[in-house]
């Protein structure tokens, strides 16, 4: 199946070249779409140069920084317009190991949504403090209980979606960003009847650049989970 790796970027000049070369080495056949939010550090220009050298690399430029969710929505739309069938979400900072992608694509043969999970057997998070692990797992468990997601890692940003999954999710109307975006996509996939599987991954904090996550994004996710949980019984009574 034609596969598109969607790579949102903002100020990733220290990572973009290594990431694109690694993706090309690991899975030479995939196309990569760099969705850049007007990075002032030259990320877009470097991606354009690498697209000419490596091939099958495309650059979608957005005029302003508009968030992770917006970048993925734009990437999904671009990919569907260009007849791709599988869509990969991955961070550019190597917190998601590109070498785990082949096993995720194998799982995508039989499932519509594949989540790279830190919290199933085999998943690891090296160098995280105990308090950070407890906070992350607690947030995931809260979303799971409140929304009935039946996944261990609903905030993971390392994923594969099929075209059919995106159609069931109606991704164009997803409004959340950051962690909330991943939870909302999972929630809609489950409600839409998409088949979901988790595969273990190793999650490593970025070595270069600054994290794009903020306190506001975390609080947004907690608020949205609570809001969706309140709405869920009404939706069940009024399908």
Regions found by a protein language model. Give the residues of each.
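Hydrophobic helical membrane-anchoring modules
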Residues: 1, 146-149, 171-239
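Short beta-strand/loop segment that forms part of the nucleotide-sugar
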Residues: 7, 29-39, 60-61, 90
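Acceptor/aglycone-binding surface of glycosyltransferases and processive sugar-polymer synthases
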Residues: 60-81, 86, 98-179, 206-221
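A conserved acidic beta->alpha catalytic loop
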Residues: 36-45, 64, 94
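Acidic helix N-cap motif at the loop->helix transition within catalytic regions
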Residues: 17-18, 41-50
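Donor nucleotide-sugar binding loop of glycosyltransferases
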Residues: 12-15, 39, 97
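Short, well-formed alpha-helical segments that are part of the catalytic scaffolds
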Residues: 12-26
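Short loop->beta transition adjacent to catalytic acidic/histidine clusters or analogous donor-positioning motifs
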Residues: 2-3, 24-34, 42, 56-57
